[in-house]
């Protein structure tokens, strides 16, 4: 009696497990995804003992495991369905036989065996899950490799373009870096050159400052000397007579009385009446003045003498060359006359052979005189001979004029050289006489004027490019009333030398 209700209860439990609607599953699988494989208890008796009639649903799968278990959900469910169907069949068969043969102990043994089978299946399931996870990872790697292998040509072209742009940018960056380095080197060189220039300018400025200091000191010394000289001047004026003082005050700084004369007058200790200088001082001053004048005249005479010697040498050389050329021309003319005479002698011999000399010998003295006198027929030949002679004379005159012009140019060159030497010596003398002029401010101007006259050369003002103009300038030199040297030079050579 007890076995019958037990079988009915087991059938109810099996019906409850087979029917999804009994446990509230409306087709969604109790919150599970369709096709999923989840753990389901196989033994109905253990289910009843642990949970009773209401069995709790299995836990939901985790998110990381959802995707890994999807491929095996269907196979797991299929395996469990097979096992559950076999269990159901066995239970039904056992339920039919349990009423007669099986007991509780046998059922327990079978349940224990079923649990062992479930554990074995669990271990196999775990191994298969691990294999599936490895295969899924391999599939992921293969998918990523396939995605990389299936990269489009557009991405490849873009990659090539980016690589080319990168190379071009690297080249531009290298060029810009080289330019920057070059500019830096150039700027460094420019900076060094400017630093050197600034240093040079500083050195030059220092030297110029030192020179300026020296010049300022010299100017101060000169001013002090000028003050001393002014004081001496006033003292010398005080020592002179009233008339001489008036003359010195009325006239300009350059007077006939030189500083040397004033020094001589002031050096004399014997004074005349009224503080005037004595006669011996005046005589010494006048003699000193005469000595200076004579020295200056002597120098001018020496210069004029040297210039006369130079001009004489130049003209002598020119005249010797002219005479040599004239002698050569005379020799050529003599040779021509000899040739003409030989030709006439040969013609006469030919005429004698032809019988002309008999008629010529028969000419009387009157015929010979008529032949000598010019006639109308012979006037043309004579005119031709005269024209030839005039042309020859004109050519000779032109040659002489050119030779004289060359001689004059040589003379002018000598004179210019001499004038330059005189200017150099005069400049050196002026440099030497600067302190003397400061110590004696009342030096007369006639010495400077004579030096200027000595340096003046009227030949320099004449143009030497045209020979005839040079000859005219020699014949009629310009006269300067202030300079006696030009008069001596104009009279140094006679006018007959130019026309022989």
UniProtKB/Swiss-Prot annotation:
InterPro entries (UniProt xref): CCDC125 (IPR034608)
Compartments where located: Cytoplasm
Renumbered to this chain, the Polar residues biased-composition regions fall at 92-101
In the record, Phosphoserine modifications are located at 492
Q: Which Cys residues form disulphide pairs?
A: none
- PANTHER family assigned: COILED-COIL DOMAIN-CONTAINING PROTEIN 125
Name of the protein this chain belongs to: Coiled-coil domain-containing protein 125
- Give the classification, highest ranks: Eukaryota, Metazoa, Chordata, Craniata, Vertebrata
């Amino acid at each position: 009696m007890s076995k019958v209700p037990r079988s009915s209860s087991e059938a109810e439990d099996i019906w409850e497990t087979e029917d999804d609607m009994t446990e509230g599953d409306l087709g969604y699988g109790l919150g599970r995804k369709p096709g999923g494989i989840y753990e389901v208890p196989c033994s109905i008796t253990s289910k009843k003992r642990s949970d009773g009639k209401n069995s709790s649903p299995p836990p939901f799968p985790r998110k990381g495991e959802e995707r890994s278990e999807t491929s095996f959900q269907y196979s797991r469910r299929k395996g469990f369905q097979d096992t559950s169907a076999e269990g159901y069949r066995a239970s039904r068969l056992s339920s039919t036989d349990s009423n007669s043969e099986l007991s509780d102990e046998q059922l327990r043994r079978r349940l224990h065996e079923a649990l062992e089978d479930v554990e074995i299946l669990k271990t196999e399931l775990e191994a298969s899950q691990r294999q599936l996870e490895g295969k899924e990872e391999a599939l992921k790697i293969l998918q990523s490799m396939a995605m990389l292998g299936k990269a489009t040509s557009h991405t490849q072209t873009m990659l090539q373009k980016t690589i080319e742009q990168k190379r071009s940018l690297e080249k531009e960056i290298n060029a810009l870096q080289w330019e920057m380095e070059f500019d830096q080197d150039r700027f460094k060189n420019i900076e060094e050159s400017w630093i050197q220039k600034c240093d040079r300018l500083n050195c030059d400025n220092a030297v110029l400052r030192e020179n300026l200091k020296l010049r300022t000191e010299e100017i101060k010394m000169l001013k002090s000397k000028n003050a001393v000289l002014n004081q001496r001047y006033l003292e010398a004026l005080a020592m002179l007579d009233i008339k001489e003082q008036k003359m010195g005050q009325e006239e300009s700084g350059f007077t006939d009385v030189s500083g040397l004369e004033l020094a001589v007058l002031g050096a004399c200790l014997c004074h005349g009446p009224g503080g005037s200088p004595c006669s011996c001082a005046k005589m010494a001053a006048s003699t000193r003045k005469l000595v200076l004048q004579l020295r200056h005249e002597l120098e001018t005479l020496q210069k004029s003498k040297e210039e006369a010697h130079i001009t004489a040498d130049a003209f002598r050389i020119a005249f010797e060359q002219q005479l040599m050329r004239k002698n050569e021309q005379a020799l050529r003319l003599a040779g021509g006359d000899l040739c003409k005479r030989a030709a006439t002698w040969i013609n006469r011999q030919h005429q004698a052979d032809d019988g002309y000399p008999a008629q010529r010998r028969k000419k009387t003295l009157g015929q010979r005189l008529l032949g000598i006198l010019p006639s109308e027929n012979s006037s043309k030949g004579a005119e031709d001979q005269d024209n030839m002679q005039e042309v020859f004379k004109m050519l000779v005159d032109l040659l002489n004029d050119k030779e004289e012009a060359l001689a004059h140019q040589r003379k002018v060159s000598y004179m210019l050289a001499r004038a330059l030497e005189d200017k150099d010596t005069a400049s050196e003398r002026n440099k030497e006489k600067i302190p003397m002029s400061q110590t004696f401010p009342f030096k007369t101007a006639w010495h400077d004027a004579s030096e200027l006259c000595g340096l003046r050369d009227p030949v320099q003002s004449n143009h030497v490019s045209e020979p005839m103009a040079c000859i005219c300038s020699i014949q009629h030199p310009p006269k300067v009333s202030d300079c006696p040297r030009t008069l001596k030079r104009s009279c140094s050579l006679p006018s007959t030398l130019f026309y022989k």
